A protein has these predicted regions:
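Basic, glycine/lysine-rich polyanion-binding surfaces/domains
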Residues: 1-130
C-alpha cells in the first residue's frame, strides 16, 4: 500500500476508504474536520489507541522477517502494509531508506508484547532502546 507524505504529515492507505494520518501537528485533526463533510466522512482521533515502535538500521528488514510474513525485498520507501508480527496485528510504514527506518503501529494493549517480540528478534543484531 502506498503512503503520501510531506515534511510533517504521512497519510497511510489502510484499506478501501480508510486512511491513517500520522502527524506531530496537533491542529491537523481540526483542519481535516473543517474540510470534510460530516455526512460523507468520519474522522477519529486514534492518538491514544496505538503504540508505535520505530526501527532503524541496516538489518531492519531481516529483523522484521523473523516475525512478519511480508516479502520485505519488495518493500520500498513510502510503502505500508497491514500484517502480523508474532500474531499481533500491525501496520508497518517504511519512512526512510537511508538508513532503512520502519514504524510499526499496533493497538496499545499489545504494545508491551510487541516490544518484547521485536527486541527478541533484534538480539542477534543488537539494539538500543531510545
Amino acid at each position: 500500500m502506498h503512503v503520501n507524505s510531506n515534511n510533517e504529515t504521512r497519510i497511510l492507505w489502510n484499506g478501501p476508504n480508510n486512511w491513517i494520518v500520522v502527524s506531530k501537528n496537533k491542529e491537523i485533526l481540526i483542519n481535516i474536520k473543517k474540510k470534510c463533510d460530516d455526512k460523507n466522512f468520519a474522522v477519529t482521533d486514534l492518538s491514544h489507541s496505538r503504540t508505535v515502535i520505530e526501527l532503524k538500521g541496516n538489518s531492519v528488514k531481516e529483523i522484521l522477517k523473523k516475525g512478519c510474513p511480508i516479502n520485505f525485498s519488495e518493500f520500498k520507501l513510502n510503502n505500508c502494509a497491514n500484517s502480523v508480527f508474532h500474531g499481533i496485528t500491525i501496520t508497518i510504514d517504511m519512512i526512510s531508506d537511508s538508513p532503512e527506518t520502519f514504524r510499526i503501529f499496533a493497538l496499545r494493549s499489545f504494545g508491551e508484547s510487541l516490544y518484547h517480540s521485536v527486541t527478541d528478534a533484534c538480539l542477534e543484531d543488537g539494539y538500543r532502546g531510545i
